[in-house]
Amino acid sequence: MAQGQQPILVLPEGTSRYLGRDAQRMNILAGKILAETVRTTLGPKGMDKMLVDSLGDIVVTNDGVTILKEMDIEHPAAKMLVEVAKTQEDEVGDGTTTAVIIAGELLKKAENLLEMEIHPTIIAMGYRQAAEKAQEILDDIAIDASDRDTLMKVAMTAMTGKGTEKAREPLAELIVDAVKQVEEDGEVEKDHIKIEKKEGAAVDDSTLVQGVIIDKERVHPGMPKKVENAKIALLNCPIEVKETEVDAEIRITDPSQMQAFIEQEEQMIRDMVNSIVDTGANVLFCQKGIDDLAQHYLAKAGVLAVRRVKKSDMEKLSKATGANIVTNIEDLSPEDLGEAGVVSEKKISGEEMIFVEECKEPKAVTILVRGSTEHVVSEVERAIEDAIGVVAATVEDGKVVAGGGAPEIEIAKRLKDYADSISGREQLAVSAFAEALEIVPKTLAENAGLDSIDVLVDLRAAHEESTYMGIDVFDGKIVDMKEAGVIEPHRVKKQAIQSAAEAAEMILRIDDVIAASSSGSSEEGMEEMGGMGGMPPM
């Protein structure tokens, strides 16, 4: 700079900027730290994490996406890996930990290639080629199956190591029945399976209700507690006298006018109730409020009514009973009513709940999850959600792959052969991608207390003979996973590898990180805090 020339500030004061290798090193390190955090939770022998938030609420889980959501992560590169886990959860419901640790390992291998002076663009290109080839290999080794036995095995594999060991089989039965029940034209709408959790009793006391459970109670004690052969009305409007939108005053000059006014209000409420009762409805679910007087008249008519039901529950009730949700009482007709064998109010763990059961061919069902404590019930709920996702994926795709690290080893083996056919430096990236996939069986072995090097060597040798050889973490042997019944949906692996590759590729392409200083804090303050959210300092 020439003497006396004024420095030019392009960025605001206090902004941190990292270029080139510094930016890549920092982002890769953040990704590796995040992957290491969830790595110990992988597999049937994976450990749990205890997460305590600022209010002292505790979550005990080994579900990858739950851990990452509960952690207060601020580093931008680490946040990208959290998005990988969320995408995996939304798409297939399982394989979140697998996706994150593969992404972390891809970044680790990329770091070695960067030190060999290989350009990030070449590494990214090689990773993309490897990911595309991996998808082809996965399609080739997939097993066509969607029979009940396969679905049971898929569900049990997904729940292994998630606090459901003793009740794996009965829970798998419930999940397969639930998915099969809501399936329509080969597609499964997972939102139509409601999971209602209540502490108390044992995990294997969990049940499947062919209908919907509503966590509400009757609006009036005079209403029947149980209605058989229920005719159900669903209303999305209040049963009360409408308030005027403008302020209005009524001048009363005579007490009889006041009485007439009150009687008119009562008559309006009575007419509303009569129009419901006249359709033949003996059960009413209302999304809005029900006036006290309307409750009285409904109780006199022997109608079981529930108010302020959630919109999502109303939609499930419609799917389960065949009722139409009506937004105007005057439009309610007998054709809009749904049917259920029994609607009753039951006490579960000291709380009243409404059970809508024995629906004919319901397209919405409920799994009532039980467990000894709130933490147990929450972890079982997460395991069931994962299992529903994988069973639904298997029903829709009709394809599965072996578990126990078998597909990763097979893909790695074939990718190494494929790498030899590639000219140029991309070959090194494809080989690195193949090695990165071996992190899955390696982690499964380490978490089971086995020697990961011995296991990997044995697995590679076994795959010269069979595609389906994987590690049985319970006895430490290499077995045929297909024969052992350890299988996973094809979609879970496909999505995990695809998401991990895309995230790693995106992070590698970043060569400049510009971080604006947060208001009221200095760069030194960030350094003292250990960078962003406990990640490498920026």
From Swiss-Prot:
PROSITE patterns from the UniProt entry: TCP1_1 (PS00750), TCP1_2 (PS00751), TCP1_3 (PS00995)
Keywords: ATP-binding, Chaperone, Nucleotide-binding
Superkingdom field: Archaea
Region (Disordered): 518-538
Gly residues composition-biased segments: 528-538
InterPro entries for this protein: Chaperone_TCP-1, Chaperonin_TCP-1_CS, Cpn60/GroEL/TCP-1, GroEL-like_apical_dom_sf, GROEL-like_equatorial_sf, TCP-1-like_intermed_sf, TCP-1_chaperonin, thermosome_alpha
SUPFAM superfamilies, per the entry: GroEL apical domain-like, GroEL equatorial domain-like, GroEL-intermediate domain like
Example of a GO MF term: ATP-dependent protein folding chaperone
Gene3D superfamilies named among the record's database cross-references: GroEL (3.50.7.10), GroEL-like equatorial domain (1.10.560.10), TCP-1-like chaperonin intermediate domain (3.30.260.10)
Name of a matching Pfam family: Cpn60_TCP1
Family label: Belongs to the TCP-1 chaperonin family.
Subunit structure, interactors included: Forms a Heterooligomeric complex of two stacked eight-membered rings.
Function: Molecular chaperone; binds unfolded polypeptides in vitro, and has a weak ATPase activity.
Matches recorded under NCBIfam families: thermosome_alpha, thermosome_arch, thermosome_beta
Protein's name in the database: Thermosome subunit beta
Species of provenance: Methanothermobacter thermautotrophicus (strain ATCC 29096 / DSM 1053 / JCM 10044 / NBRC 100330 / Delta H) (Methanobacterium thermoautotrophicum)
Lineage: Archaea, Methanobacteriati, Methanobacteriota, Methanomada group, Methanobacteria
Protein encoded by which gene: thsB
